[in-house]
A protein has these predicted regions:
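N-terminal basic/disordered segments at the start of proteins
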Residues: 2-34
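A short acidic Gly-Thr/Ser loop motif
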Residues: 11-17, 140-147, 200-203, 277
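Short solvent-exposed loop/turn micro-motifs enriched in small/polar/acidic residues
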Residues: 2-4, 132-133, 142
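Preference for bulky hydrophobic residues occupying beta-strand positions
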Residues: 11, 42-44, 140, 149, ...
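Conserved ATP-binding subdomain of kinase catalytic cores across diverse folds
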Residues: 31-45, 69, 75-76, 84
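Helical "lid/coupling" subdomains associated with nucleotide-phosphate turnover
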Residues: 8, 22, 49-80, 88-136, ...
Length: 296
């Protein structure tokens, strides 16, 4: 018997926030696919504890647990039968990540998988390119603790994760050798080919909203200019002048620094943003692996 599931959800425990994405399962011509139904972002910054102390404090752990319990309660009310949970850079950095994930499972029945950097980068393989040509596109996910990059051309995939993220840089826990590693890896990609740097996640969307809200693309010079502006403003000015969320106001310039570093290798490129998220990849992967899931 097929397991009928009208909705699936994914909880993504990041370094700067918890992201919850809920999907409606649809079928068309014998193909089952997921459509984003609703999403929620909860500001719980694990990265400060993770990158400064290599351990999640009891206070931060409590905030995390309470937030996920509330999400689970809401999911249960909507009869969401299957929930996938992933954790990324902050959780794989700390000494008590496994213990916390087991505690979450015990309290909510949600299994949380701590992704390796490589696993996180490989999920970008599920990115929906839409109008972007694959051979001209670099998919980049800059989070609070790490940056994942994916390139696909002529049947060849290049995927890599680097421990360079906006919160990590804010806390001055980025290492010069990781910047060197990023530069060396980027030389594997034909620089003249890349026209589109597609940023997935909230940092890229915020950057393009500020620079070019209607066209949704930004040049490297525009990014450099915005970075300089942000560096010359205090926290309150960033929030009020740019309407930045408080939990991004202190890190956006650091996300821009990573984008600039990448774009310097690709002189013909512009930064685009996408609403796609690695949670979409997790759900798509689950649908491919479990053929018993279908639309209700």
């Amino acid at each position: 018997m097929k397991n009928k599931a009208q909705r699936l959800a994914c909880i993504d425990i990041g370094s700067n926030a918890i992201k919850y994405r809920q999907y409606r399962i649809s079928s068309q011509k014998s193909k089952t696919f997921a459509e984003l139904d609703t999403f929620k972002r909860i500001s719980v910054r694990l990265g400060t504890d993770a990158f400064k102390f290599k351990k999640i404090s009891s206070e931060t752990e409590q905030k995390l647990l309470e937030s996920i319990i509330k999400l689970k309660e809401k999911a249960d009310k909507k009869d969401i039968k299957i929930i996938s949970g992933i954790a990324t850079s902050a959780m794989r950095t700390v000494s008590n990540g496994d213990k916390i994930c087991k505690k979450i499972t015990k309290k909510t029945d949600i299994e949380i998988k701590i992704l390796s950097g490589n696993e996180e980068a490989q999920l970008l393989n599920f990115f929906n390119y839409k109008s972007f040509k694959k051979e001209e596109t670099l998919v980049v996910d800059i989070g609070g603790g790490s940056t994942e990059i994916f390139y696909q051309a002529s049947g060849k995939n290049l995927a890599k994760s680097f421990p360079l993220g906006a919160v990590r840089i804010l806390e001055k826990k980025d290492s010069p050798k990781h910047w060197v590693n990023l530069k060396e890896w980027l030389t594997k990609i034909p620089s003249e080919n890349i026209k589109n740097i597609v940023g997935v996640g909230g940092n890229a969307r915020l950057i393009n909203e500020i620079i070019n809200k209607h066209d949704r693309r930004s040049s490297i010079d525009e990014l450099r200019s915005l970075k300089k502006e942000l560096e010359n403003k205090n926290f309150e000015e960033k929030v009020s002048f740019y309407s930045l969320p408080e939990d991004r106001a202190d890190i956006l310039e650091h996300a821009i620094a990573i984008f600039v570093e990448i774009m310097e290798f690709f002189p013909n490129s512009c930064l685009f943003d996408s609403s796609w998220n690695i949670a979409d990849a997790v759900i798509e992967k689950k649908l491919q692996e479990n053929k018993n899931i279908q639309a209700a």
